[in-house]
């Protein structure tokens, strides 16, 4: 058992827990920064350790293509290659099948694709992506799945479920024959069709995965459908295992995920938005490129304790963004990841204190507005 619930909210499905990944213990709900190619863009492993992150995400598809499994094997895995000393989760490449669909072709037992880099041809199967993730050295491996677009026809959604379930069974069979210290998570699909979602959840929960993931949400569907599916599946999840909502990381989405029992989140938005000049604060979102911050001598967030806010003014960081200095990206990214760390900590404390809905309302009010106006 890698997961233990430590407290539960009495009015929602929100809970706190401990996730134990080969000796690295994490408090949940937890947010994972995304290091697609083996690094969280613009910041170092030292920064992540200073920020006290213990779990990051890497991408199997991209790491398989570059630097490639031969290099990773030579170094003893991504963690030794990058000197990352804590835990690592890798996705399987299933989402890249969805997002780069024109370059891929599904087959019965896998997916053929062309590299987006040089056009070379490759083939992923449920077994091969487990082997690749083992070479990467993942603490949590995700199974290969078929993520259909949310607006797919019933026929396409049915294909997605059948393929996802077949590949999940193949993954479990292969994994159990060749177990190591890695943990395997299953993924359920179904688009925005609640009936298919529940069918897929039932199937994936029936298999001996270490954790369960919600795939194919927050991929462009209307927000009301995102909420409807979260609420619809919440009562049927297996509370003995961690629940991971893949690719989700906005403040409102995390709040609704936690409310419905989600334990784990990842998303590129805190880091991508930082590079585009949007930062998260205790007062709401701020666009650093806005002219009104040009002469401001206050920090990004007067209530933030990160080293960026302790040292630099918002006017200075705006200037760096305005002239295209790379330091703007690293400073803004550091701040946003500090914010996310503290935000999840506040959520955990509110659940433990029986005040989650109070925190839920506070942050929803702040982050459903377009931008803090100053």
Curated annotation (Swiss-Prot):
Residues 247-253, 271-275 are annotated as: RNA binding. Substrate binds at residues 91-95, 145, 189, 216. Zn(2+) binds at residues 304, 306, 309, 335. GO terms for biological process: queuosine biosynthetic process; tRNA-guanine transglycosylation. Its EC number is 2.4.2.29. Binds 1 zinc ion per subunit. GO terms for cellular component: cytosol. It holds the Pfam family TGT. One of its GO terms (molecular function) is tRNA-guanosine(34) queuine transglycosylase activity. It comes from the Bacteria. Keywords: Glycosyltransferase, Metal-binding, Queuosine biosynthesis, Transferase, tRNA processing, Zinc. It is an enzyme of class 2 (transferase). It catalyses: 7-aminomethyl-7-carbaguanine + guanosine(34) in tRNA = 7-aminomethyl-7-carbaguanosine(34) in tRNA + guanine. Its cofactor is Zn(2+). Pathway: tRNA modification; tRNA-queuosine biosynthesis. The active site is at 91 (proton acceptor), 266 (nucleophile). Belongs to the queuine tRNA-ribosyltransferase family. Catalyzes the base-exchange of a guanine (G) residue with the queuine precursor 7-aminomethyl-7-deazaguanine (PreQ1) at position 34 (anticodon wobble position) in tRNAs with GU(N) anticodons (tRNA-Asp, -Asn, -His and -Tyr). Catalysis occurs through a double-displacement mechanism. The nucleophile active site attacks the C1' of nucleotide 34 to detach the guanine base from the RNA, forming a covalent enzyme-RNA intermediate. The proton acceptor active site deprotonates the incoming PreQ1, allowing a nucleophilic attack on the C1' of the ribose to form the product. Homodimer. Within each dimer, one monomer is responsible for RNA recognition and catalysis, while the other monomer binds to the replacement base PreQ1. This is Queuine tRNA-ribosyltransferase. The lineage of its organism: Bacteria, Pseudomonadati, Spirochaetota, Spirochaetia, Leptospirales.
